[in-house]
Amino acid sequence: MQSKTLLAIGGAFSGVGVILGAFAAHGLKKMIDLPMVEVFQTGVHYQFIHAGAILLCGVLILLQTNTPSAQKCFSRAAICFIIGIFCFSGSLYALAMTGVKWFGPITPFGGLMFILGWVYFVVAALKINEVKS
């Protein structure tokens, strides 16, 4: 994935995270029970962490022009983080808002995608060729 695309996606997820966090803090508490607000806030928390990771992947892809294998792994990490946000955070948002329990089993898949993304991130970091001056 291109660096500019990842930077845009990471920025968008971050901005949406701010909106959802504010909604959870100010509006959602009037609509649903406190335990479900906490579920929603967990989704926001993980969205923020991984939006930042997507931004970092975008920057590192941009900086690693001399290491295509690292770029590829950072790109794969970011894709896993994107899928993880949709599945993990998205399922928590849906569960909190609707109370529909079948959203629950989607959450662990998103968590696995986060873990896989971090594995790719570590592999990418190990592939970085440091330029010596």
Go through each PLM region and give its residues.
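Polytopic transmembrane helical bundles with strong interfacial aromatic enrichment
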Residues: 1-133
